[in-house]
């Protein structure tokens, strides 16, 4: 009977562990991208799309573009604010506005 407490990753070679780590990181990045797309869609779609047709009209396209850009701007601002609170001295030292 197999030992349930044994870590199977420990049996991998160093190169296999590195490959597994890179694969997991890649999958996590895909999940983050999918989450961002879901957030963009749930935030911007109701604001910008009236009737569903074969393609977006110019105003819908522009609205979606502006909405996503504002969404990204807000998220960047929040991340920057958090980073400044957490690592402010480092950001100031590196020359970012503080």
Swiss-Prot record:
It is a peripheral membrane protein. Disulfide bonds join 44-67, 48-63. It is found in: Mitochondrion inner membrane. GO terms for biological process: protein insertion into mitochondrial inner membrane. Coiled coil: none annotated. One of its GO terms (cellular component) is mitochondrial inner membrane. One of its GO terms (molecular function) is metal ion binding. Its main location: mitochondrion. InterPro entries: Tim10-like, Tim10-like_dom_sf. Keywords: Chaperone, Disulfide bond, Membrane, Metal-binding, Mitochondrion, Mitochondrion inner membrane, Protein transport, Translocation, Transport, Zinc. Gene3D superfamilies: Mitochondrial import inner membrane translocase subunit tim13 like domains. A motif (Twin CX3C motif) lies at residues 44-67. Heterohexamer; composed of 3 copies of TIM8 and 3 copies of TIM13, named soluble 70 kDa complex. Associates with the TIM22 complex, whose core is composed of TIM22 and TIM54. Interacts with the transmembrane regions of multi-pass transmembrane proteins in transit. Belongs to the small Tim family. The twin CX3C motif contains 4 conserved Cys residues that form 2 disulfide bonds in the mitochondrial intermembrane space. However, during the transit of TIM8 from cytoplasm into mitochondrion, the Cys residues probably coordinate zinc, thereby preventing folding and allowing its transfer across mitochondrial outer membrane. Mitochondrial intermembrane chaperone that participates in the import and insertion of some multi-pass transmembrane proteins into the mitochondrial inner membrane. Also required for the transfer of beta-barrel precursors from the TOM complex to the sorting and assembly machinery (SAM complex) of the outer membrane. Acts as a chaperone-like protein that protects the hydrophobic precursors from aggregation and guide them through the mitochondrial intermembrane space. This is Mitochondrial import inner membrane translocase subunit tim8. It comes from Schizosaccharomyces pombe (strain 972 / ATCC 24843) (Fission yeast).
């Amino acid at each position: 009977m197999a030992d349930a407490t044994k870590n199977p990753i420990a049996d991998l070679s160093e190169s296999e562990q590195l490959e597994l780590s890179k694969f997991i990181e890649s999958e996590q990045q895909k999940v983050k991208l999918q989450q961002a797309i879901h957030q963009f869609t749930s935030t911007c779609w109701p604001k910008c799309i009236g009737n569903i047709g074969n393609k977006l009209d110019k105003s819908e396209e522009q609205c979606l573009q502006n909405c996503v850009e504002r969404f990204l701007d807000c998220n960047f601002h929040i991340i920057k604010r958090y980073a400044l609170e957490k690592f402010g001295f480092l950001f100031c030292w590196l020359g970012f506005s503080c």
